[in-house]
Regions:
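Beta-rich carbohydrate-recognition and catalytic domains
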Residues: 1-42, 51-117, 126-256
Length: 256
């Protein structure tokens, strides 16, 4: 929402809005309220909002308690008016992954099948054929102070959001090869019983429209710059920069 920032003495960093006065006529609606006493996940962060099929579509990271702490997952919800929202559903679940290929710091702190931490600054992409894709990245946090977006995570995953807001199966859209992970070394597991989770590369599916949408996304270099942090050692595809936001001006130039 819009915040008036003129002649303000101090900002209260303990408040989400800085304690600044809101503009008249602005309303704020809460999508989710969590209560730790009920066992609910209270770390809810990184909202990604788009419009699709006449509804608002929102995804965000939801974790048990802390940033970069497991278990966490990406969930999503929809709304017709931005006021009333559906109960959140899992988009990208909490998983484990094989750490043999991990080449980052503090490897000795990781078990063979380590808890994955989701991290992403870009989720939704609607391709020219109308397909709506959702993505996130799965990384590792060997300890609480080691972020999963340090370039040594495993892979970015993708799935399609259908017109009825159900989801396709999960696929890999990009392995973090610069960080040590390839198709042959990237293996996911269920946390409840350590059983394998089959997540193929996106081009192995028979759905040509989905494959085309994923390939189109991978061809959009400017959009892929939003993936930089998680794959920062892939110098072939990325320039140095963090959390890129951009828009197209009236003259066609890109402002970032």
């Amino acid at each position: 929402h819009v915040i008036e920032c003129y002649n303000v003495p101090d900002i209260d960093m303990n408040k989400h809005d800085g304690g600044l006065p809101h503009m008249a006529g602005v309303y704020t609606y809460q999508v989710r309220r969590s209560c730790r006493a009920d066992g609910d996940y209270t770390y809810n962060h990184a909202p990604m909002l788009t419009g699709f099929n006449n509804r608002l579509l929102l995804s965000y990271i939801s974790g048990k308690k802390d940033e970069h702490g497991a278990p966490d997952e990406v969930v999503y919800t929809t709304s017709k008016d931005g006021i009333t929202w559906e109960k959140e559903r899992t988009m990208f679940p909490y998983m484990l992954a094989d750490t043999k290929a991990y080449i980052g710091p503090d490897k000795e702190l990781l078990p063979e099948h380590a808890k994955m931490i989701v991290h992403s600054r870009m989720c939704f992409y609607q391709a020219s054929n109308g397909r709506m894709l959702a993505t996130t990245f799965y990384g590792f946090s060997p300890d609480f102070h080691r972020a999963p977006n340090n370039g040594f995570g495993a892979a970015r995953l993708v799935r399609e959001v259908y017109n009825d807001f159900t989801l396709s199966d999960i696929f890999v859209i990009k392995y973090n090869t610069a960080g040590g992970f390839t198709k042959d070394t990237t293996h996911f597991y269920k946390p409840e019983d350590d059983s394998p989770v089959n997540i193929p590369y996106y081009d192995e599916v028979a759905d040509e429209g989905f494959v085309s949408a994923c390939s189109e996304l991978l061809s959009k270099k400017l959009i892929l710059e939003q993936w930089y942090e998680e794959e920062m050692y892939d110098k072939e595809h990325y320039v140095h920069g963090r959390a890129l936001s951009f828009y197209t001006a009236k003259d066609g130039s890109i402002v970032g």
